[in-house]
Swiss-Prot record:
UniProt keyword list: Developmental protein, DNA-binding, Nucleus, Transcription, Transcription regulation
A Pfam short name: ALOG_dom
Protein name: Protein G1-like8
Family according to the record: Belongs to the plant homeotic and developmental regulators ALOG protein family.
GO molecular function: DNA binding
Species of the source: Oryza sativa subsp. indica (Rice)
Chain intervals with Low complexity compositional bias: 9-29, 179-215, 223-239
Domain ALOG: 32-159
Location in the cell: Nucleus
Main location: nucleus
Comp. bias (Pro residues): 167-178
Signal peptide feature range: none
Length: 239
């Protein structure tokens, strides 16, 4: 009996432990632009599959892209007045009219931009991009002008910033010693100081002359005193 129990324990240990299923990693959320671009690309591919006669992406041209844009007009929500409508050219008509709804020019322009990027991201050469064809650009320009006149909403072009002409950089200010005004001020100050010094020397020499004259006029005693005082340092030097 004990041996049978040991075999049961061995079988229990041999059974693999059931592992929990790995947690599903959350899918990376696409941005709003990327999601819209993917939807637009799938819509265009579906349009090519339903096209009669069948049309492949390699044979798609700018004319087919324009045909696709006209096909989308039936799903538009923008009122575009006809030339014979009484509200033609009025941005806010007072009453409804039987004019059809169309895709707004701004929506078509943004759509072409997304499809143009999606075409190149799918591995196709930019040179063969039908969404970048000149005919598509001309068609979008015509739609823009026609809707602007019909809706009475002028299209304002974005003003491009004009490249300012490169002007030479301003020269740095000269140091004080090189500035004409400062040099003139220093020159005038130096001249004034020199004139004051000359005047002081002149007054000193005049005073000395006056003193000498007064001593000379005082008689021989003063002369002897001056001579003695002058000779005194000589005697002291000899000692």
């Amino acid at each position: 009996m004990e041996g049978g129990g040991g075999g049961a324990d061995a079988q229990a240990q041999a059974q693999p432990v059931a592992q929990a299923p790995p947690a599903m990693q959350p899918m990376q959320q696409l941005s709003r632009y990327e999601s819209q671009k993917r939807r637009d690309w799938n819509t265009f591919l579906q349009y090519l599959r339903n096209h009669r006669p069948p049309l492949t992406l390699a044979r798609c041209s700018g004319a087919h892209v324009i045909e696709f844009l006209k096909y989308l007009d039936q799903f538009g929500k923008t009122k575009v007045h006809a030339s014979g409508c009484a509200y033609y050219g009025q941005p806010s008509p007072p009453a409804p009219c039987p004019c059809p709804l169309r895709q707004a020019w701004g929506s078509l322009d943004a759509l072409i931009g997304r499809l143009r990027a999606a075409y190149e991201e799918s591995g196709h050469a930019p040179e063969s991009n039908p969404f970048a064809a000149r005919a598509v650009r001309i068609y979008l320009r015509e739609v823009r002008d026609a809707q602007a006149k019909a809706r009475g909403i002028p299209y304002e072009k974005k003003k491009r910033k004009r490249t300012q002409q490169q002007q030479p950089p301003p020269q740095p200010p000269l140091p004080p010693q090189h500035q004409p005004g400062a040099a003139a001020g220093e020159a005038s100050s130096s001249s004034s100081a020199a004139a004051a010094a000359v005047a002081a020397e002149g007054s000193g020499s005049s005073a000395a002359t006056a003193a000498a004259t007064s001593q000379t006029g005082g008689g021989g005693g003063s002369t002897t005193t001056t001579t003695a005082s002058a000779a005194a340092p000589t005697t002291a030097t000899r000692v």
